[in-house]
């Protein structure tokens, strides 16, 4: 869901709302103290997180988008464990209890997995047509240019110290971008 200015704010907030809808549908299980926390984490990983990250492969995310997703995730996980922020329990401890990797890392994994699919396709494939490119001789307005998906991928590759040519080898690429659950 692109906005007129090319931003993804509405899409991120919509995905967070969808995650909360899934949460409410399953609140009977997730808020039950008799259900083991490991099982709650597995349910979160299989039902709620995919709903929140649906379509995120194509998002050129900014720090605030990642932060919004992270905040929503931690609120859900804390609630599932029966804790609040007042209990002053660290996020890492909560994540270990329910065995859930940070949504930020999973978001990057999804984006890099999609990048690998694109890299392995021939250059005339339809998937390359949909990529936005900046025109060289077009005058644009003042201010910083909008963040593109390619720039997000470059940043992710640099942060994770992965060479983009590795994407041509499917097995090695899968190992390089894998984010294990704790």
Identify the residue ranges that each predicted region occupies.
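Short linear motifs embedded in intrinsically disordered, charge-biased segments
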Residues: 1-182
